[in-house]
Amino acid sequence: MSSLSRELVFLILQFLDEEKFKETVHKLEQESAFYFNMKHFEDLVQGGEWDEVEKYLSGFTKVEDNRYSMKIFFEIRKQKYLEALDRHDRAKAVEILVKDLKVFASFNEELFKEITQLLTLENFRQNEQLSKYGDTKSARNIMLMELKKLIEANPLFRDKLNFPPFKVSRLRTLINQSLNWQHQLCKNPRPNPDIKTLFTDHSCAAPTNGARAPPPANGPLVGPIPKSAAFPPMGAHAPFQPVVSPSPNAIAGWMTNANPSLPHAAVAQGPPGLVQPPNTAAFLKHPRTPTSAPAIDYQSADSEHLMKRMRVGQPDEVSFSGASHPANIYTQDDLPKQVVRNLNQGSNVMSLDFHPVQQTILLVGTNVGDIGIWEVGSRERIAHKTFKVWDISSCTLPLQAALMKDAAISVNRCLWSPDGSILGVAFSKHIVQTYAFVLNGELRQQAEIDAHIGGVNDIAFSHPNKTLSIITCGDDKLIKVWDAQTGQKQYTFEGHEAPVYSVCPHYKESIQFIFSTAIDGKIKAWLYDCLGSRVDYDAPGHWCTTMAYSADGTRLFSCGTSKDGDSHLVEWNETEGAIKRTYNGFRKRSLGVVQFDTTRNRFLAAGDEFVVKFWDMDNTNILTTTDCDGGLPASPRLRFNREGSLLAVTANENGIKILANTDGQRLLRMLESRAYEGSRGPPQQINTKPPIVNTLGSVSNVSSPMAVNSERPDRALPTVSMSGLAPMDVSRTPDVKPRITDESEKVKTWKLADIGDSGHLRALRMPDTSATSSKVVRLLYTNNGVALLALGSNAVHKLWKWQRTDRNPNGKSTASFTPQMWQPANGILMANDTSDGNPEEATACIALSKNDSYVMSASGGKVSLFNMMTFKVMTTFMAPPPAATFLAFHPQDNNIIAIGMEDSTIQIYNVRVDEVKSKLKGHSKKITGLAFSQSMNMLVSSGADAQLCAWSIDGWEKKKSRYIQSPANRSGALVGDTRVQFHNDQTHILVVHESQLAIYDAKLECLRSWSPREALPAPISSAIYSCDGLLIYAGFCDGAIGVFEAESLRLRCRIAPSAYIPPSMSSGGSVYPMVVAAHPLEPNQIAVGMSDGAVHVVEPLDSDPKWGVAPPQDNGTHPTISAAPAAANKPEV
């Protein structure tokens, strides 16, 4: 629907409300979905009219639309259910349970079971979580507070919660103006015309006696005006524009070349004053009406119904954008200037953005293409992704050529979508990627867009067609709009004559538009109509400029730097396209492009001269500065969180400084104290079920900016809102007597999770139609997580793929659905060269390309490169002797491979030129492990000599070597295969030997180790980090699997072989996992390759989705290892 049609609906709503057609008003609100009347919604809820509540809501959202909507409907139906129980109306309660609440069972079966169990209680308040449930009225009011917060946070209600302000009886006024205009065109205008209908145009009848009509009387232009409508005002917005000029007020003044079409030809024939620009304040406040004819008010028509509804009222003044700005009560003390956190990303940070809902979650992008997500409250990096092309086959040839020429890539911009469910990343070469974000730190690949030729310089999210879109701009001088979820292109805007540097989408009066700036300093504006730019203005400095609105969308600012280093921070008068205010304080020539941000509709901040500078928006002089305790670059990047309580600033040496004001410090202290209290809670709480309130997701965290994700209990705050079944006022805190538990008591009462039968997990044996079986010596997931690749001791590969089905629509790997064993139609096998040797005695090795298209593998013979789709051998190289024993791709160049050899050397091989660039010597036995750290710029190797070596990537010289330490219960020098894998933080190393698991730092110092004992006494056969870096999975030679805490190496769960090996396949302990593979996206799923050739996928049950619980901490301290979900260095094990 066009914006004018939408505004017409608002006029009709106002008219219906003034005429007291209340039911019709709310019906139109629901059917049009333009305005959600919160007052009407509150009345329905407080009156318990649940059917009407859901009926009204249905016009705006459905249960399955998003997690906010799901939570809204859940709370309503839950309250209806509890009220039925409170009335002891069991039949009605059962009906609600089956018809209304059953839908939520598919999202959380445990929740549904617990709600069902309330039927068995005489009084549901006997349930501990509902013990504070009061009477019906108070419960409804408490729930209503929660619902209002959910509705305000729900993106589907964007721009629908406020009614636009305009004069009362606006529709009558427009009709009166139209009648006056029609009367002016009468050939024989009468002094007191009689308007009897609106169905046809007015025309005075000719005089019957041939006399001319008397001259017109000077009467009022409009009739009596009723009282103001009951709709709440939305804020400073312009009124409905006269039909003569439909251009939006917010952008009209910039549109020097705009030619709006006139919908009625008769209007163009009128006096010039009728078609003047709509941004003229006098015209807005005093619309001109022809005065050559007497005024007509259609209320004078012969309509008894209308006359009955007439009432004298008071005129009100029109408010319009940019007229004035309300006074702000904030002071300089509200600025975040105190350094409270120092984080290190590991590489230079190029972009920052705080989560729009979770105030302490920070997204960062770096100069090596990495993105990371930090929980600044706990100082933990909860997610990490290194750059990779997800599907190289779908990329354009220019992109493939660019990556082949230079694999280095940087993040130019990363940011969150408005509701924080999606994040977007723009790279310095062609690509934009979007991820779906889950608050437990999980990132799921969503869309990969080959967006521009050259770099993608900026991105932004918008809702041009009620669906989330992502706007991109690039070096190819284009601006494009894409569907954020599918990556489908929607619009292309061209007109810039230089690379486009930044984009700034916005909306005013339901008109959506985009500002863009190019590196030649040109500012342009675009509507979503592909009719070209509406603006062509010059930015101060004529070079790199970014634009941003204040949080309330009423003030527009830009900040830029010229080629000479002169920086400019200005406020624009957006209705006139002129600079309104220029801020002082840039005294020296900037050494980089100055970045800026706004907060609280009051303050501006920019990074310049090695400090952060602050301004009051209404004062051109600098307000204050902070050097953040030193260590800032010349032009630091910075970003406020939504509330303005925290400020993230980039620092030297890959650092990020977090600054806070009083509110921010209080927020972080609360997070710390609650995390501490949670760690000291009563031991009996460890095995209790989580509160029902958040089991549908993390929606409830919109209740407070201090809420954290409930899906990560190790970082969650104690719930202060109602647990599950009855929401409480978040301002109330439970009256709980603290209990101090002795640490030794915790250790004594904690119990290891020991899974001994298949009923406590999900396990699936991969189907295998091959006639022969051999040991699985290598196993790995593809990078997208939808396939498993195994290499047997007979040199033959096997590939399993999960297919998309009705039951598994996403085609994700899971133990719930059997995958297909993949093989080309011609039946070809993917078999390694064996060079007439015995592959059973050879050391096999395998490595997968980042795009999952090719696999490199060897089994004692030549190294073969296979096409994963056709199984064809693309090439072979490195004929033995010596044979290759380990393969690892260089993190920055896929054409360079580190190859561990049987003769103890490491060869750095360039595939493109078929040449060994370097040969590294330092081991005395064959190489059994290689791992790269891009951030540390090093390669770590391990060998059958139980030695670790660190090598510099730059010159390939050896930096250090060390033999792994022998456990206390083992004498003599260690020998045997040793594996290495870098943690996601790129600084800690997991070292795996049959005698131990050990964590080393980058200096090859052993930080801690664990040796087989007690519950897991057998030698270790394999081990690997989980994809989020929080767990370590280890296989043992007796068939058991151990799940360890990655940071402390404490055992949290033991999985007996009887739990995942079918009884028919068991062979008395002789079968064991030779290799363990971790899923790249699901941290609690693993695959194990067995000594009998079988492959099993193992994961916990949905009802208990984690492997046991974390063991209690002792009084010792350990170096912290950050958690990050991206498996940046997935080892070949």
UniProtKB/Swiss-Prot annotation:
Gene3D superfamilies: YVTN repeat-like/Quinoprotein amine dehydrogenase
Location of the CTLH domain: 34-92
UniProt domain LisH: residue ranges: 4-36
Deletion phenotype: Semi-dwarf, with reduced male fertility and shorter panicles with arrested branches and abnormal spikelets.
PROSITE patterns per the UniProt record, alphabetical: CTLH (PS50897), LISH (PS50896), WD_REPEATS_1 (PS00678), WD_REPEATS_2 (PS50082), WD_REPEATS_REGION (PS50294)
Tissue/organ expression: Expressed in stems and panicles. Detected in roots, seeds, leaves and sheath. Expressed in the meristem and lateral organ primordia.
Residue windows of the WD repeats: 344-384, 451-492, 495-536, 539-582, 586-625, 630-669, 771-810, 838-876, 879-919, 922-961, 970-1011, 1015-1054
Keywords: Nucleus, Repeat, Transcription, Transcription regulation, WD repeat
Superkingdom of origin organism: Eukaryota
Presence of the UniProt keyword Repeat in the record: yes
Localization: Nucleus
Region annotated Disordered, chain positions: 1102-1133
Xref: SUPFAM superfamilies: Nucleoporin domain (SSF117289), WD40 repeat-like (SSF50978)
Primary location recorded for the protein, binned into one broad class: nucleus
InterPro entries noted in UniProt: CTLH_C, LisH, Topless_fam, Topless_Znf, TPL_SMU1_LisH-like, TPR1-like_2nd, WD40/YVTN_repeat-like_dom_sf, WD40_repeat_CS
Any one Pfam family match given in the protein's UniProt record, by short name: WD40
Biological process annotations from GO: inflorescence development; regulation of DNA-templated transcription
GO cellular component: nucleus
Functional summary from the UniProt entry: Transcriptional corepressor involved in branch formation regulation, presumably by suppressing primary branch formation and promoting secondary branch formation. Required for the cell elongation in the first internode and pollen development. Probable downstream regulator of strigolactones signaling important in axillary meristem maintenance. Acts in auxin signaling and is associated with the regulation of histone deacetylation. Essential for the function of miR172 microRNA and its target genes in regulating panicle development.
Recorded domain comment: The N-terminal TOPLESS domain (TPD) (1-210) binds directly to a 12-amino acid LxLxL EAR motif peptide.
Assembly, per entry: Tetramer. Interacts with D53, probably via the EAR motifs. Binds to AP2-1/TOE1, AP2-3/SNB and AP2-2/IDS1. Interacts with WOX1. Interacts with MOF1.
Record-given protein name: Protein TOPLESS-RELATED PROTEIN 2
Species per Swiss-Prot/TrEMBL record: Oryza sativa subsp. japonica
